[in-house]
């Protein structure tokens, strides 16, 4: 959903990095790491882009609270504690409901260079697109083209890898659910909701209340007056630079 993720400023090497990557990960400076977590997880990153309870609930509904894919994707606070991660007393993670993504944790073994001396950074490769996304796109295309058997094969290849029971038939709703779970935090959800025509309902209250997670639990400290998906969000705004270069380009409605 973020348009400006990369600054290509050749004169400032500091500017040539991905803003989204900085926001991902855990707020490790506010945490204590013990045991397995201390051995595996690199320090750094800011702790934004955390999963909502609604995503956790969707996983539980689809595969149970002990689902293999759920355990590899996100953890609740009790599971984080069992892994060896504790939020320090007096610290908090803004925009968090007590769930953290596990799939994007930065492992020491993946680090090109340890940059834990500065909280924002870690040097590790990011996945831009996975084979699972290709399969899900193919499944949707085949289903809409009248090839449900091929679509079923595509989606079950993902489910088998995730140790889920294969489906015996497939619908568009099956593909929507599978894509939400398999590709969460991989920059596909917003665009999918828009093109499916589901965004207005699915994102109706998005951004209304902002959670804050601390060692005392979850509190709701702020409520926005403007929130949710609006008609203008069907299209992204046209950048000012493009409109300056071509005055004939009109800004999209609402922006």
Explain the meaning of each model-derived region.
Residues 1-39, 121, 126, 152, ...:
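Long, intrinsically disordered, low-complexity segments
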Residues 1-89:
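An aromatic- and glycine-enriched ligand-binding surface/loop that stacks and positions planar moieties
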Residues 22, 47, 98-103, 238:
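Coiled-coil-like amphipathic alpha-helices with heptad-repeat character
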Residues 29, 54, 71, 105-110, ...:
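Small/flexible residues
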Residues 54, 92, 132, 240-242, ...:
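A generic alpha-helix propensity feature with a strong bias for hydrophobic helices
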Residues 59, 63-158:
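C-terminal substrate/ligand-recognition segments
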């Amino acid at each position: 959903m973020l348009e400006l993720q990369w600054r290509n400023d050749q004169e400032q090497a500091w500017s040539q990095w991905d803003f989204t990557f900085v926001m991902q990960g855990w707020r490790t400076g506010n945490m204590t790491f013990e045991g397995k977590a201390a051995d595996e997880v690199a320090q750094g990153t800011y702790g934004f882009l955390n999963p909502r309870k609604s995503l956790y609930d969707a996983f539980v509904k689809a595969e149970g609270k002990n689902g293999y894919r759920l355990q590899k994707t996100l953890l609740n606070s009790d599971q984080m504690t069992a892994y060896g991660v504790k939020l320090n007393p007096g610290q908090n993670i803004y925009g968090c409901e007590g769930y953290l993504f596990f799939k994007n944790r930065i492992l020491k073994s993946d680090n090109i260079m340890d940059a834990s001396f500065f909280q924002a950074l870690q040097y590790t490769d990011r996945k831009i697109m996975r084979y699972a996304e290709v399969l899900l796109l193919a499944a949707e295309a085949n289903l809409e083209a009248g090839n449900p058997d091929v679509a079923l094969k595509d989606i079950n290849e993902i489910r088998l890898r995730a140790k889920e029971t294969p489906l015996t038939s497939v619908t568009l709703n099956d593909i929507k659910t599978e894509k939400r779970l398999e590709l969460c935090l991989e920059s596909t959800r917003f665009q999918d909701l828009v093109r499916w025509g589901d965004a207005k309902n699915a994102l109706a209250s998005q951004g209304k209340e902002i959670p804050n997670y601390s060692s005392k639990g979850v509190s709701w400290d702020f409520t926005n007056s403007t929130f949710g998906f609006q008609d203008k969000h069907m299209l992204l705004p046209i950048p000012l630079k493009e409109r300056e270069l071509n005055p004939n380009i009109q800004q999209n409605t609402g922006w």
